[in-house]
């Protein structure tokens, strides 16, 4: 289930990215305006289309990840254990979780070709500081996938802090496995587990 959630989330989160800052564009309009940019880039570059992991990872780093609030995502994924973590542990958790998502999203991006995204209109007021943008991914030969993603308004603009695929939260799914690891081996154990997983993924390149 988690793999399916991450794969589906990758498309929507990728399609939100552009050189236009979140502060200048409403969240739903940002998604609507830039739908297809990443898919176009993949189709136009034979290396990307062939699944070149390094190039796809670079694409994700440049076009997608600047628009995530990784600190908030990590805090939500770690849950109640976050308050028990030291500053150094929090920094390590954010770094390792970010690396995990970078590589997971990069792998998933290489699988997208002909999907389309329908972005539902959002009623946004001037005082809103967090919103949920609802979208539907249509995939040839497959069932449409409803995706809601939570965004918050920060001084630097709108950023993503959670994604719900067919009602299931990406952050909540990670929280379950993170809590299991922390119960068994503590926060340092979770950091090591994430670090080991990232090292293993890196070795597969």
Residue ranges: model-predicted function:
Residues 1-9:
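Bacterial N-terminal signal peptides that target proteins for export
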Residues 8-18:
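Bacterial N-terminal signal peptides
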Residues 82, 99-100, 124, 139, ...:
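Solvent-exposed loop/turn segments at secondary-structure junctions
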Residues 162-205:
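Low-complexity, intrinsically disordered terminal/linker segments enriched in charged
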